[in-house]
Design a protein with these regions (language model features):
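Short, glycine-rich nucleotide/cofactor-binding loops
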Residues: 75-77, 184-190, 305-307
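N-terminal accessory targeting/assembly segments
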Residues: 1-121, 126
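Extreme N-terminal, non-catalytic leader segments
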Residues: 92, 97-103, 108-111, 115-179
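Conserved catalytic-core segment of NTP-binding enzymes
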Residues: 124-163, 225, 250-266, 271, ...
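NTP-binding/hydrolysis catalytic cores, primarily Walker-type P-loop NTPases
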Residues: 45-61, 79, 345-346, 353-370
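N-terminal phosphate/diphosphate-binding loop that engages ATP/GTP or pyrophosphate donors
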Residues: 200-244, 251, 316-320, 336-346
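Walker A (P-loop) phosphate-binding motif
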Residues: 163-217
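Charge-biased, low-complexity intrinsically disordered regions
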Residues: 83-85, 116, 120, 204-208, ...
């Protein structure tokens, strides 16, 4: 696919239409607040309140987490936007949308970076991430093209950033319920499905389950699945003030994890299930799991993989770093043959989704952590 910043300008008719719409909007002189009221707002921005005195900043360098009003110039891979409620809203050329800047790491989709200016960029994720795509999976269509119209700011001219609406920071509690972590070999290895199944199994025991996604790209799907599976309280890194966690400092990843776990404890959780995005070799995931913090934060881990070899190597990698590996799971358990291979070579019990949903299996896993 072609990843040029001006690809959306190649259609002269579309360019003229966009100019005409912009001219009519200019004549009507809507306030920024009125434009924001009509704009389609992304799920990533759900915690930020807009006042009537909101303004737009131009000629500034965006930062990760900054909110931006942008115009859709060409539809591509993402032709829908998840709104604050999680509904997938259809997009049209000329729409104004409110999204958050953020880096994106998604091997099955895009790698995208926050640009150094407010020039043309892309909708890098359906949850509402503005960034400039620098690499794409060959299966992807062209990214949806955006023109930023300005960063959102308050009456004092201070930019609105997700960090300003975050949960209060917390340290990792000294006394807390057990925390299970779902890890994986890669993106799309079955982590989220396994996490949801474990939540279901623990809930069927009568436990109050809290769930969190501590790294990844802001979107509604995974948290909604956790809640549907029985979690009483669900949080993610957006609640901790980040649109995405790609390229975030390691200290920030630890702070996000501690804050989310602490707030789930305060909500009265009997047990907590945490998902860490992507695979063991991804930058932030690897740093987190190689740090001593992860041993204090996670009492037991389950590892998801798409095949037996990945499961065996992942379990070994985690054990070498001192983690309490409770089971291997993931996509490979959907195939009886792959599951059989994993059972032969993996130094951990192999548990499929249907087993993790069982209160008997959930009770057995619960008994193997503090």
């Amino acid at each position: 696919m072609k990843l040029t910043d001006d690809s959306h300008l190649s259609n002269p008719l579309a360019a003229r239409e966009a100019a005409l719409v912009a001219a009519f909007r200019e004549r009507s002189h809507p306030t920024v607040a009125e434009r924001l009221h009509l704009a389609k707002r992304a799920h990533t921005t759900r915690r930020v309140a807009f006042g009537a005195d909101v303004r737009l900043l131009s000629d500034v360098a965006p930062r990760s987490g900054d909110l931006v009003l942008a115009r859709v110039d060409a539809l591509g891979q993402h032709d829908k936007l998840q709104d604050p409620s999680g509904r997938r809203v259809s997009l049209f050329v000329g729409d104004e949308i409110v999204v958050a800047y953020g880096h994106r790491y998604a091997p099955s989709q895009f790698e995208a970076l926050v640009p150094e200016d407010l020039g043309p960029c892309h909708l890098a994720a359906g949850g509402g991430i503005a960034a400039r795509v620098v690499a794409a999976n060959t299966r992807m269509s062209e990214p949806t093209a955006l023109t930023p119209l300005g960063l959102l700011a308050d009456a004092r001219g201070e930019r609105l950033n997700l960090a300003g609406a975050a949960l209060a920071p917390r340290a990792l509690p000294a006394q807390r319920p057990p925390v299970f972590a779902l890890l994986g070999a890669s993106m799309d290895s079955g982590k989220t499905t396994a996490a949801a199944a474990l939540i279901r199994g623990l809930s069927r025991l009568g436990l109050r389950v809290g769930a969190a996604k501590v790294t990844g790209t802001g979107a509604s799907g995974d948290p909604f699945l956790f809640r549907d599976s029985g979690a009483r309280e669900v949080l993610d890194f957006v609640d901790a003030g980040c649109a995405t966690t790609y390229l975030a400092p390691h200290e920030q990843i630890e702070a996000i994890s501690a804050t989310l776990i602490a707030h789930l404890c305060e909500a009265g959780s009997d047990v907590i299930v945490v998902e860490v995005a992507d695979g063991l070799l991804q930058r932030e995931t690897r740093a987190l799991l190689e740090a001593s913090f992860s041993h204090r934060a996670f009492d037991g881990v389950l590892f998801a993989a798409a095949d037996a070899l990945g499961a065996a190597q992942g379990v070994r990698w985690l054990r070498e770093r001192g983690h309490n590996v409770l089971a291997a799971t993931g996509l490979m358990t959907a195939s009886p043959l792959a599951r059989r291979e994993a059972e032969e070579v993996c130094d951990a019990a192999v548990r499929g989704v249907e087993q993790l949903e069982s209160p008997l299996v959930a009770a057995e896993l619960r008994s193997r952590v503090r």
